[in-house]
Curated annotation (Swiss-Prot):
Keywords: ATP-binding, Helicase, Hydrolase, mRNA processing, Nucleotide-binding, RNA-binding
Enzyme Commission code: 3.6.4.13
Gene that specifies this protein: prh1
Motif (DEAH box): 216-219
Keyword Cytoplasm: no
Helicase C-terminal domain: residues covered: 294-466
Residue ranges constituting the Helicase ATP-binding domain according to the UniProt record: 106-269
Stretch list, region Disordered: 1-48, 64-88
Top-level class of the enzyme under EC nomenclature: hydrolase
This protein's name: Probable ATP-dependent RNA helicase prh1
Organism name: Schizosaccharomyces pombe (strain 972 / ATCC 24843)
UniProt GO cellular component terms: nucleolus; spliceosomal complex
Length: 719
């Protein structure tokens, strides 16, 4: 982003943005009290008079036009093959910035084995380039694979391209994501997640069914993307006819070009619209409160246009959604209502699709999203962006073997991507809930995942695909040797590797289950312990956000409601109790049951989806889903301990819990059913850092189980 000092590029002077006096149609809107530090308020129900969020208009960014998601009819209607519909869609395609580069791109792809395509989110590269390939002579046989870091992007892009091709989803165009494959023998354009293409490498090491591999959103540098980059570099040496296209929305193309030995770089010029950047004058002490106030300031004072708000996670999104709905009731009748639409990765697919539909009549749509909306998806109608400048980022401490998910500042590159969402279709505005000085302190780029997260899944993926030497793999950015060694140790602890570090039969079976290694190991152990159905239920609960709600204004009631589900042996069995009771309730009463028991219906829907998919996966492999009315808690906990042997801690004489790996002092999180209790040993699902090191998803175990489950590992550590 080019900085402009003193004046904006459009010639306007820098002015203080005092958008509203806090009054909406003569009524004073209420908002939560501010906190003293810059964090989301935990007590979002305490109300005080709204103060104005003052912004300084400083810079102008640019976005680009976009079509994905702009055809807002239902998916069924979008796939209708009427002549008028096809004509309208063709006109939309021709209006995309990339359309003019059609001939040049086709020639570049034809002439080069690897090219790097750089184009803003909205240029049309994700939808159009796969279709351009159909006209290339080399691409008349086989299929093109287009990878995406996120499932929602793979699904939405496939639906859009199917509409543009005038076919049903699953015919010429389809998608493949975890547990959901809509492709067929007719499919020639296949959207899939990075992880799914990595899975295909197990049975087809050279990906022979594809004439072209397109790695989209490569700039995000997810762990799976970096793994694919390394494998693709090996594959092109074995397949001279294969074409590879690396696509990025940011100007870091040289790194990708260098990795592929000087690959050609193609820059797609976007149709740019100005985006005015507004910073706060001073740091906001409570960014969630500031977002709420800014939403109403924009809604009451600025012209029509939808609002996109970047938040850090589901909890914040749902809290702000509830506040917006509550305070919207105070809006006068002459103003449009606000339609709040959440968007996060674990949101059920049909609810995610609501984001892409137009707002209801006499409503302004406010999309509350994680960083999923930075580049992976396109939402039409956005004119205003509110950016907290924060995201939840995984960090792994290889010395202690502990991974945490913490809220951290984003990079300048990510901030620019966020602001650009306001300028895809017309001039827009971005309101950053931080000062310009804070922006200048942000790192230029986001650190690649491979340098900061647990590498256990990556190492298992490599070894299952024949890459035994994980240190000398073709990494774009090599991970630390310490991180790789910790991953090898973890995989050895759960029985995936033999004494020489080679993958064994158990490890190979784990690699075939689309779960994290620890959870995959628990599923395999459950077959031996005759509790597969119960373990699948618990794994489903652990694979998304908590189903239990604790609204601040009814916290005591929520705690009381959860008592009926509590199990003396901890959180895993507590979750199982709640899920079982829900399934036993009548279909007609389930909505009321959730409300009475403070159960998050949205999370529960995701849990049930994962449960259904996991059960189908097991049945497909011929596994018996044995279950019994009386749960054998010991067998269930032993199954999980097989995958969580490194996530255990012993009670010490001073009353503290210390991990068996690293001797780290940890505390049981207050939300746990074991909070305040002392048991000889515990097993936990995750560790989070707040004021201290807390563990969640905690279960009580017996200390003598440790040697029974992993004697090979504990014996080796003691020598």
């Amino acid at each position: 982003m080019v900085k402009v000092s003193g004046k904006l590029r459009n010639g306007g002077s820098i002015t203080k943005q005092n958008l509203t006096d806090g009054l909406v149609g003569g009524q004073r809107i209420k908002a939560p009290n501010k906190k003293k530090n810059r964090k989301a308020s935990k007590n979002t129900t305490k109300k005080s008079t709204v103060s104005v969020v003052n912004f300084l208009e400083q810079d102008t960014d640019f976005g680009a036009n976009e079509v994905v998601g702009s055809d807002n009819s239902s998916p069924e209607k979008r796939s209708e093959n009427s002549p008028s519909k096809r004509k309208d869609i063709l006109e939309q395609r021709k209006n995309l910035p990339i359309w003019e580069a059609h001939d040049t791109l086709c020639q570049q792809i034809q002439d080069n084995r690897v090219i790097v395509v750089v184009g803003e989110t909205g240029s049309g590269k994700s939808t159009q380039i796969p279709q351009f390939l159909n006209e290339c002579p080399y691409a008349q046989e086989g299929c093109v694979a287009i990878t995406q870091p996120r499932r929602v992007a793979a699904v939405n892009l496939a639906k859009r391209v199917a509409a543009e091709q005038g076919c049903r989803l699953g015919e010429q165009v389809g998608y493949s994501i975890r547990f959901d494959d809509t492709t067929s023998k007719k499919t020639r354009i296949k959207y899939l997640t990075d992880g799914m293409l990595l899975r295909e490498l197990i049975n087809d090491p050279i990906l022979s069914q594809y004439h072209t591999l397109i790695l989209d959103e490569a700039h995000e540098r997810t762990l799976m993307t970096d793994m694919l980059l390394g494998f693709v570099k090996k594959i092109i040496k074995k397949r001279p006819a294969l074409r590879v296209i690396i696509m990025s929305a940011t100007l870091n193309a040289e790194r990708f070009s260098e990795f592929f030995d000087g690959a050609e770089i193609c820059y797609i010029s976007g149709r740019q619209y100005p985006v005015q950047i507004h910073y706060t004058y001073t740091p906001e002490p409570d960014y969630l409160d500031a977002c709420l106030r800014t939403i109403f300031q924009l809604h009451t004072k600025l012209p029509p246009g939808d609002i996109l708000v970047f938040l850090t996670g589901q909890d914040e999104i749902e809290a702000l959604e509830a506040l917006i709905k509550s305070y919207s009731k105070q809006l006068p009748s002459n103003l449009p209502q606000i339609q709040a639409c959440p968007l996060f990765a674990s949101l059920p697919q049909e609810q995610q699709l609501q984001v892409f539909l137009p707002a209801l009549a006499n409503h302004r749509k406010v999309v509350l999203s994680t960083n999923i909306a930075e580049t992976s998806v396109t939402i039409s109608g956005i004119r205003y962006v509110i950016d907290t400048g924060l995201a939840k980022i995984k960090q792994f401490n290889s010395k202690l073997g502990l991974e945490s998910l913490t809220v951290q500042p984003i990079s300048q590159s990510a901030a620019m991507q966020r602001s650009g969402r306001a300028g895809r279709e017309a001039a827009g505005q971005c309101y950053r809930i931080y000062t310009e000085a804070d922006f200048d302190k942000l790192p230029k780029e986001t650190i690649p995942e491979i340098k900061r997260i647990d590498l256990s899944q990556a190492v298992l993926t490599l070894k299952a695909r024949g890459q035994n030497d994980v240190i000398n793999f073709h990494y774009m950015d090599p991970p630390s040797k310490e991180g790789l060694l910790r991953a090898l140790e973890h995989l050895y602890s759960i029985g995936a590797l033999d004494d020489n570090g080679h993958i064994n039969d158990l490890g190979y079976q784990m690699s075939l289950i689309p779960l994290l290694p620890s959870l995959a190991r628990a599923v395999l152990a459950a077959r031996e312990h005759n509790c597969l159905s119960e373990v699948i239920d618990v794994v489903s609960c652990l694979s998304t956000d908590s189903m239990f709600l604790f609204p601040q204004e009814k916290r005591d009631e929520a705690i009381e409601a959860r008592l009926k589900f509590l199990h003396s042996e901890g959180d895993l069995l507590t979750c199982l109790n709640a899920l079982r009771q829900y399934l036993e309730s009548s279909h007609d009463s389930r909505k009321q049951w959730c409300s009475q028991n403070f159960i998050n219906r949205r999370a529960l829907k995701t849990i049930l989806d994962i449960r259904k998919q996991l059960r189908e996966h097991c049945l497909k492999d011929g596994w018996e889903l044995n279950s019994s009315p009386e749960v054998n808690s010991e067998n269930l906990l032993l199954s999980f301990l097989s995958g969580y042997i490194t996530n255990t801690a012993l009670l010490h004489p001073d009353g503290s819990y210390r991990t068996i790996i690293g001797n780290q002092t940890i505390s049981i999180h207050p939300s746990s059913s074991l909070f305040g209790k002392k048991v000889e040993a515990i097993m936990y699902h995750e560790l989070v850092f707040t004021t201290k090191s807390y563990v969640r998803g905690v279960s009580s175990i017996r200390s003598n189980w440790l040697n029974a489950v992993a004697p090979h590992y504990l014996a080796r550590r003691s020598t």
